[in-house]
Amino acid sequence: GNIVTNGAYTLKDWVVNERIVLERSPTYWNNAKTVINQVTYLPIASEVTDVNRYRSGEIDMTYNNMPIELFQKLKKEIPDEVHVDPYLCTYYYEINNQKPPFNDVRVRTALKLGMDRDIIVNKVKAQGDMPAYGYTPPYTDGAKLTQPEWFGWSQEKRNEEAKKLLAEAGYTADKPLTINLLYNTSDLHKKLAIAASSLWKKNIGVNVKLVNQEWKTFLDTRHQGTFDVARAGWCADYNEPTSFLNTMLSNSSMNTAHYKSPAFDS
């Protein structure tokens, strides 16, 4: 079949796992103002490899996540080439709502409270991100969000409340909760998963086993619901809250947290 598009470019070549080549479309309505004639996209899983190929001149531009250990160094060495811009995206860990014991709201809430977002954002990643208290970014156009009470608590108070909830759910220091944390192959995702597992252990005594999968297998695992907690991320298709909220509808193909709420659906 033929792919039908209405953008400034058309598909010229596609080699799976190697490259996607787009060329300027002469039938695009604003073709006179299209500046670039051809664009080649390269799928690069490693952020370090991405940077190395950029600095060698092989890549003209990258919008990938910067390697944690190289970001500050690159900002000093090539400040005019490293840009940090606001993004309507949320990086998060999704909890399998249908799999015991994660179908217990106390367990899910404890994991939420026990994650020190300030350390992840400001110490581990340190690339200008904002700590998130919800799925939809507060600067989304039209969003009128109320910051939850717990977001104003100290991390110590969050940890105390999380431990109480875990104890109510049957998990203590003698019988700790053990979870599998799934992430797809990436230098950044691995480092963040290691940090997250360390924080959950230190803050609320949860044992975390890291599970790495390649992208296709990772997606299948999430859709099938055979995971505990998984790395996830979502970027808005358009600047409006429903771009985030619609993914949590029970019939959404993007609802890999397997969240179900008749009230939310209605």
Question: Where are these predicted regions, by residue range?
Answer:
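Gly/Pro-rich hinge or "lid" segments in bacterial periplasmic/extracellular proteins
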Residues: 1-38, 160, 164
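A bilobed periplasmic-binding-protein/Venus flytrap-type ligand-binding module shared by bacterial periplasmic
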Residues: 23-27, 87-110, 114, 123
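Ligand-site clamp/hinge motif
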Residues: 26-72
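Short helices/loops that flank or line small-molecule/ion binding pockets
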Residues: 48-59, 76-77, 105-106, 194-203, ...
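Ligand-binding "clamshell"
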Residues: 71-84, 224-226, 240-255
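Structural transition elements
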Residues: 130-168, 186-191
